[in-house]
């Protein structure tokens, strides 16, 4: 038996990282257009016209980072066609009581469909197992199946014994964007000047995302003659976490802002103050899932069975 030990390996919260980067981008002037579907992209002189459900957008440069839909947009402007297959992966998430079962991510030998089923702690103290690797054609096909979850349970036991699967609190699946050429496609399309791809980004896409972002920014800046902002805001205001404070710090916070003393999510210890902050901050939450991704309301053992009505009341009150 042999293994490769990688002490520099680490884990992050993927949606927490994504939201933090988006908030920082917005604070630096990036405009987000949510619920705006791109229906068609047409070349227009030296630029492009994006036809959306909310009108046309004219631009000289496009960065195509549309995940499993990146092939659709690339093929609208380029004769060098690509095809992306959605590769579904099912996961099991275990309660925090199981979080100490392993102290670092345990991978198996990779295969042609990916790195195999892993067992890993999360940054919040849970235990995560998965994923499977099933190729689909449905770009929205993210339903879990009993067969695939059984596969996760079976294969997890190869690398880690006695995983306490009786403590599973939820299961979910996601789609990786697998390009038929088995590689990332990063850069300017040869026959579509100003159209830049970040397509076919699957594992280790999260790890490489910061470097991909810098690389594409440099490419676009070089074409556009752009220079780095002098007043760039490097720091993003974090979300106040009373559970990480000392008793004295928490008491002072609650004295000044009583909403931090009202616990809404008992499983994760999330206060009303944290939920309000998640809604009011830059690119704030507008849904239960939005709150969940920012402050973990509903992510605990009862999976939002207790806190959903209270959170909906706060969302309604804050958003009108």
Describe the predicted segments one by one.
Residues 4-61, 69:
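Helical element adjacent to the flavin cofactor pocket in flavoenzyme catalytic cores
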Residues 14, 20, 110, 114, ...:
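C-terminal catalytic lobe of FAD-dependent flavoproteins
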Residues 41-130, 134-145, 154, 160-163, ...:
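Flavin-dependent oxidoreductases
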Residues 265-267, 302, 307:
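Short cysteine clusters
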Residues 294-297:
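C-terminal target-recognition/interaction regions appended to catalytic cores
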Residues 308-312, 317:
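Accessory DNA-binding and partner-docking regions appended to nucleic-acid-acting proteins
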């Amino acid at each position: 038996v042999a293994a490769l030990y990688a002490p520099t390996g680490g884990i992050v919260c993927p949606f927490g990282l994504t939201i933090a980067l988006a908030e920082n981008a917005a604070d630096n002037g990036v405009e987000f257009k949510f619920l705006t579907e791109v229906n068609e992209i047409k070349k227009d002189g030296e630029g492009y016209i994006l036809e959306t459900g909310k009108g046309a957008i004219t631009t000289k440069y496009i960065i195509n980072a549309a995940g499993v839909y990146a092939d659709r947009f690339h093929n609208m402007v380029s004769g060098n066609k690509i095809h992306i297959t959605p590769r579904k992966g099912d996961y099991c998430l275990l309660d925090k009581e199981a979080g100490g079962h392993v102290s670092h991510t345990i991978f198996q030998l990779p295969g042609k469909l990916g790195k195999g089923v892993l067992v890993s702690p999360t940054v919040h103290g849970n235990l995560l197992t998965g994923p499977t690797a099933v190729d689909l054609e449905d770009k929205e096909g993210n339903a879990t199946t009993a067969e695939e979850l059984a596969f996760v349970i079976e294969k997890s036991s190869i690398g880690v014994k006695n995983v306490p699967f009786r403590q599973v609190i939820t299961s979910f699946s996601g789609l990786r964007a697998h390009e038929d050429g088995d590689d990332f496609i990063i850069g300017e399309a040869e026959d579509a000047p100003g159209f830049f791809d970040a397509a076919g980004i699957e594992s280790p896409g999260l790890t490489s995302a910061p470097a991909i972002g810098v690389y594409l920014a440099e490419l676009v800046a070089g074409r556009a003659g752009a220079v780095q902002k002098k007043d760039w805001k490097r720091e993003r205001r974090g979300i106040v976490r009373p559970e990480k404070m000392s008793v004295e710090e928490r008491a002072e916070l609650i004295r000044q802002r009583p909403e931090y003393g009202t616990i809404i999510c008992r499983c994760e210890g999330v206060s009303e103050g944290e939920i309000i902050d998640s809604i009011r901050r830059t690119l704030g939450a507008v849904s239960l899932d939005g709150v969940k991704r920012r402050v973990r309301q509903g992510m605990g053992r009862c999976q939002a069975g207790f806190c959903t009505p209270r959170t909906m009341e706060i969302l309604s009150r804050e958003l009108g």
